[in-house]
Amino acid sequence: MTKLYDYYKNNIIQNLMHKFNYRSIMQVPKIKKITINMGVGKSVTNKKLLEKATEDLMVISGQKPVITTARKSISSFKIRQGQPIGCKVTLRGSRMWEFLERFIFIAMPRIRDFRGLSIKSFDGHGNYSIGIREQIIFPEIDYDTVDDMRGMDITITTSAISDNEAYALLTAFRFPFRK
């Protein structure tokens, strides 16, 4: 696995057990999966944009993305039901740990005007969502081949019961939250 996973196994589990007074190691929250979603609204008129977004997401995650389709028709957006409008990847296991390590220590410091992550992005069940405006923060993306700046949503799903537990878990992973 990765250094981050070893750090979780050796340090974070013990720290969280003492902090929240867990009786078993199985009660300690862990990261279950990371979902990366890239919505391409302009793909309605230009199919090449969706192909490029899929390619970018594949390079970032190391896994082939699934094309997402519209659930229902919306005439004001010129979208029909079943029309492809984005792509997503769900990472688990070793790919998840590798992506998380690259995201925390390489990609996040490259975000322009970064002032820390918002604490308000927890969903109430211990999951955290981050919105990224540019895909070029990842070193795998070649800046010269980028045709359009595309954002993405990154959702970190944890086994934590409350937001406080998830916050403690992500802080232990050195997520830079705003004070």
Swiss-Prot record:
Lineage: superkingdom: Bacteria
- Check the record and name the PROSITE patterns matching this protein: RIBOSOMAL_L5
Q: Kindly list any coiled-coil regions of this protein.
A: none
The alphabetized UniProt keywords are: Ribonucleoprotein, Ribosomal protein, RNA-binding, rRNA-binding, tRNA-binding
GO (cellular component) term, any one: ribosome
Q: Name one Pfam family in it.
A: Ribosomal_L5
Asked if the keyword DNA damage belongs to this entry, the reply reads: no
Molecular function as annotated in GO = rRNA binding; structural constituent of ribosome; tRNA binding
Q: Tell me the Gene Ontology biological-process terms attached to this UniProt entry.
A: translation
What does it do? This is one of the proteins that bind and probably mediate the attachment of the 5S RNA into the large ribosomal subunit, where it forms part of the central protuberance. In the 70S ribosome it contacts protein S13 of the 30S subunit (bridge B1b), connecting the 2 subunits; this bridge is implicated in subunit movement. Contacts the P site tRNA; the 5S rRNA and some of its associated proteins might help stabilize positioning of ribosome-bound tRNAs.
Kindly give the PANTHER family that the UniProt entry links to this protein: 60S RIBOSOMAL PROTEIN L11-RELATED
> Which NCBIfam families does the protein's record reference?
PRK00010.1
Q: How does it assemble?
A: Part of the 50S ribosomal subunit; part of the 5S rRNA/L5/L18/L25 subcomplex. Contacts the 5S rRNA and the P site tRNA. Forms a bridge to the 30S subunit in the 70S ribosome.
Per the record, the similarity remark reads:
Belongs to the universal ribosomal protein uL5 family.
* Name of the protein: Large ribosomal subunit protein uL5
The record lists the lineage as: Bacteria, Pseudomonadati, Pseudomonadota, Gammaproteobacteria, Enterobacterales
The gene coding this protein: rplE
